[in-house]
From Swiss-Prot:
One Gene Ontology cellular component annotation held by this UniProt entry: cytoplasm
Role of this protein: Allows the formation of correctly charged Gln-tRNA(Gln) through the transamidation of misacylated Glu-tRNA(Gln) in organisms which lack glutaminyl-tRNA synthetase. The reaction takes place in the presence of glutamine and ATP through an activated gamma-phospho-Glu-tRNA(Gln). The GatDE system is specific for glutamate and does not act on aspartate.
GO molecular function: aminoacyl-tRNA ligase activity; ATP binding; glutaminyl-tRNA synthase (glutamine-hydrolyzing) activity
Annotated keywords: ATP-binding, Ligase, Nucleotide-binding, Protein biosynthesis
Protein name: Glutamyl-tRNA(Gln) amidotransferase subunit E
Reaction catalysis annotation: L-glutamyl-tRNA(Gln) + L-glutamine + ATP + H2O = L-glutaminyl-tRNA(Gln) + L-glutamate + ADP + phosphate + H(+)
EC numbers, comma separated: 6.3.5.-
One Pfam family this sequence matches: GatB_N
PANTHER family recorded: GLUTAMYL-TRNA GLN AMIDOTRANSFERASE SUBUNIT B MITOCHONDRIAL AND PROKARYOTIC PET112-RELATED, GLUTAMYL-TRNA(GLN) AMIDOTRANSFERASE SUBUNIT E
Upper lineage: Archaea, Methanobacteriati, Methanobacteriota, Methanomada group, Methanopyri
Chain ranges passing through the membrane: none
Domain of life: Archaea
The keyword Ligase is annotated on this UniProt entry: yes
Amino acid sequence: MREEDLDWEEIGLRVGLEIHRQLDTSRKLFCRCTPELVEEVPKEPKVRRKLRPVQSEMGEFDPAALEEFKRDRTFYYLADGSFSCLVELDEEPPHEPCSEALDVAIKVTLLLGGSVVDEVHVMRKMVIDGSNTTGFQRTMLVGFGGEVPTSEGPVRISTVCLEEDAARKVKGRDQDLEVDYCLDRLGIPLIEVSTEPDIRTPEQAREAAERIGEAIKAVGGVKSGIGTVRQDVNVSIEGGAVQEIKGVQDLNLIPKVVKYEALRQANLLRIRDELRERGVSETDLIDCEPMDVTDVFEDTDSEVIRRELERGGVVYALLLPGFEGILGWELCPGRRFGTELADYARRRGVSGLFHSDELPKYGISEEEVEAVRQRLGAEDGDGFVLIAGPEDRVKSAMEAVKDRAIMALKGVPAETRRARKDGTTEYMRPRPGAARMYPETDIPPVVIDEDRVKELAEELPEKPWERKERLAEEYGLGEELVEQMFEHGVVDEFEEIVEETGVEPKVAAATLVNTIPRLEKDGYPVDNLTIDHVKEVLRLYAEGAIAKSGIEELLGALAADPDSDPEELAEELGIVMASEEEIEEVVEEAIRRYEDKIRERGMAVMGKIMGEVMEVLRGRADGKRVSELVRERIREISGE
């Protein structure tokens, strides 16, 4: 199935969102450390840890945690007293939750039209990928309900939570089986807004994510910049399974991620049907065991295999009955079913795999392929995979590949996947289950009293989507200009400038979203500009003291010398509007130069005269007034 064949309603597309944003508080969520990232990662102290899953209160292991444990990874944590303490190292109990962060979460809940809980209970969410020293992430439900509007209908809000951000990955070694983490990011407050799976199209997913992001930003108290916003997308289709896609950084990438994931699931369902039609059963695959075929590749031309053998590694093959043609089946652009198997293999510490649908290739000869098929007892229609590397890792990777091949008979396994820059995704781990969550025993519940909620409700800003409509209507602005002001975060400044200077709204908006960014691009130190600078420049324009063309020049000069007086600077730059007498003098001088041609050609020379006059005045005169004067003098001379 191709992308253009997808009908969202027909395939039953369902999408939910989880929007995360770091909060700009004075302390971390569960300690007093400063919530900032360090410029230089410390080398010491360095703490070594191994993490293991524990059973839930029901005696169950979370499948995602169990899968991580099978990778047998080692983690090293780099800490420094300037940004972390014993809480981050899990050597001291957590402190009470940050009240600033809690206030932001309450306000976001209220702005979205949701309800705030009476008591906040901190929970532990098991995570043993090394990003949390404790082996779990602390999270708390603050609100539920509400909705955001989209052009395709409202999207309901499921929950608003507060959680601690994860440690920052610094470096991975040996196929990520050893990882260094910096503890500066661990514990920074993070708000998470989750939706119900109400979204029905890829574009609606982007729109809903934008609306939620606007609401969080409108409340304030949030960080900005790279890495402060993370968007997870949950996607499923009819007959498929929910996939949690992590880390979609770019808002505009969301539609592509949704499309490609829907396409991937649709093709996995087709593969399931094809395997069933071929009569492949789970028993057929269970009976297949990995086989050592190292001797087949003793003199191989494959650089990958030869390198592993030189390191003392082995080569194993696994028969996949009935999988011929399936392994090379494209699921979405650039991703085949064989790629899915390779993802599972890599999680066990090998560099990848070869599959029969792509062989002979990569230095593996036809003779070697045939020798492997004979060793495995492969028949027509069968496929196989090859993995090279250390024997223990190869065996573990083969186990994962075999499990994934068996899953193909059932359709689409529920997974947590990572978003890639091209919009495709790759396997990370199984979807977590209910056994993942259990109560935090070190922090008592936080009671949210009604007075606190009422006080915060009085501080709520206007809903961003309603404010956009009002700005467009009240100030006569186009939708694109309004959107640009929101993107640049200058809406408050815009309204303040218009109210205090009386300048035309379109000029004020264009100055904030076009002129100042252009000056920055040209190398001007625009960080030196304050809103008072902008107001004074636009006031001069509104009063007719400078021309519109002088706005950018004056702002650039003020950026370079912010202590200057704007009016005096305008005089020095020669951008003060010309007086009526000066305009008349310049016009008269041009008329004298062209008097003979005026008598010959009349109005035909008006364009040349206008050009010269405006060049002399350098935009310091209203073009309409200049045109009137020139036209009047030409008529007097030519008699037209």
